Regions:
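Ubiquitin-like/PB1-type beta-grasp interaction modules and other compact soluble beta-rich domains
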Residues: 1-173
Length: 173
């Protein structure tokens, strides 16, 4: 009888479920990072937007899917880990291709908030930057440090419209 009472009063959670319900437990000594998700470039390119996305609330009127939000940084966390945690916690749709499913060896973000690669023209898709810099490698390979700022930005022009200049194998601000 006692075992039944203990089990009934116990909330059994996976590690991910626990961390998602304790995501706001930021203490003064916590290492943190900030993440935001924006698609404001779409607002200037509505003629190119997939007609199915023009209906409903897929594109926020200000282009902000997730305002800058702070998350606890755990050892070994990557840009992808924080994105995954943020979209789960905020119930934002995301689809990605695993690192074992492509030739890049890193996770590839296909879509966020139902906005996918090519949803707003042939050069559109998701890019990320950390502390204002666009890395030239995948999000699951970028290990984060305390205090860094991650921005996921939807581009409609292969990054040019968001300040990313692709230069061969390197990228610049």
């Amino acid at each position: 009888m006692l075992v039944a009472l203990v089990i009934k009063g116990t909330n059994i959670q996976s590690v991910d479920e626990y961390y998602l319900t304790h995501i706001d437990d930021i203490r003064p000594d916590s290492e943190t990072v900030t993440i935001s998700i924006r698609c404001d470039t779409v607002l200037s390119n509505l003629d190119d937007l997939d007609p199915a996305l023009k209906q409903g609330d897929y594109i926020p009127s200000d282009g902000v899917i997730l305002p800058p939000t702070e998350y606890v940084l755990r050892p070994g966390d990557t840009v992808f880990d924080i994105l995954d945690r943020a979209v789960r916690y905020n119930k934002i749709q995301m689809e990605y291709q695993g690192s074992d499913e492509n030739s890049y060896g890193s996770v590839y973000i296909r879509g966020i908030n139902y906005l996918y690669e090519f949803s707003c023209g042939p050069l559109s898709g998701w890019v990320y930057r950390v502390d204002g810099e666009y890395p030239n490698f995948g999000c699951s390979k970028y290990e984060l440090k305390d205090g860094q700022n991650i921005e996921w930005i939807y581009t409609c022009d292969l990054g040019e419209d968001v300040g990313c200049e692709w230069v061969g194998e390197e990228t610049a601000k």
